[in-house]
Each structure stands twice: as structure tokens, then as C-alpha cells.
Amino acid sequence: AIVIKDSKQITEFKEGILPWSIQNPVALVFDEYDAGRPDVMFVIQRILESEGNFTLLDKNKVLQQHDFFRMFATTNTVGLGDTTGLYHGTQQINQGQMDRWNVVTTLNYLPFEKEMEIILSKNKKMDNKEGKEKVANMIKVADLTRKGFINGDISTVMSPRTVLHWAENYNIFKDVGYAFRVTFLNKCDELEKKIISEYYQRCFGDDLPESSVNIKI
């Protein structure tokens, strides 16, 4: 790091976030862990041991883990690499390292009521009878895309974040169909738009231009 000493700018070694966290009662979370480069991941591997220490070669120093230091990571692929093509840029994680994670759990899509609660908490203007009905239908569309993805019917899926953006865009454009197109449908494969439009029609009772009923033969 560049620091000022005696009115002069000098470069000196400063401990980064990982060495600092190890020595303190900190819960350190690595987001998108499976996007890390393999050479970086090996640095972390030693820390994953139950009493793993961290060596700072620049200072010839060995750091002891604080008793209450904890490390967490989030991934999209559980370390197995991207088999779907949805998470380009992720890496396979060394199985020796995966073996050192003593707890692994999966967070699936939220229950309907919880997803509804989150969307409404971020969109206060829709926290009324009409708004709740629209949000409920948005979540139903999202659920159909998730089932369609699992069944192999479509290759793009709506996450809770997508539903949140859809609700936000509805508040801007005041048109639920247009908001759906610019939020999600425009990101989808042309060959799948008809299927996704059918999902929308089932939940809202309205046809989008991409729907099969509007396709002229």
C-alpha cells in the first residue's frame, strides 16, 4: 500500500482483508466463490483446516486463527463447474478443497409467501389489494419458468431478483406486459419466447405480441 510517512509517499506492506479477518472474531463471506482463480483458491485451502494458520511470506510471519473466526462462501455450481451454460466464468473447485468445507447446504427458491413479502417490502407502492394481485401473478410466472427450466422446455429462468426488477419496472412504465418484456422476455432465446409468453398469458390472462395466438402463418 502507498502511505505517507514524514511527509513522504512510500510503499509498504499492509495486511489485506484475509489476514486481518483471521486474527479477529469475524465472519468472512466469499461471494461467487466458484469464480475464483485456482491459484488464489489454494491460498484459502490451508485456512479451511480446523486449526489452519496463514503464512505471510513477505513478513516471515505465521498468523494464528482467532477462536471465533468463521469463513463462509456462496457459489452457483457447488464446485462442480458450469454444466448448464448459465454461469459462464465459474471454475471447478479442487475436490481436496471441497472436502475441507465441513458444512454444505443448498438454498432453493423461496416459498411463495416469502418471495411475495420481499417484493412488497421493496415496492411499497404495490402493497395494496391490486398491487398484491399483480405481484402474486408475477411470482406465478416466475415459478412456471423455473418448472419449465427443470423440465428442459426453456433455458432461461426468472430469479427473485428478476421478479423484483419486473415490479420496479412496472412502477415506472405502468404496464405489466411491457415491463415483463423489457425485464425478462427480451433476454430470452427467440425460439423460447412463445413458451414464456404462454406462461404470462396463463397467469395474467393477457396475450403478449410474442404469444402464439398473435403469430400469423
Predicted regions and their residues:
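C-terminal regulatory/interaction module of P-loop NTP-utilizing enzymes
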Residues: 1-217
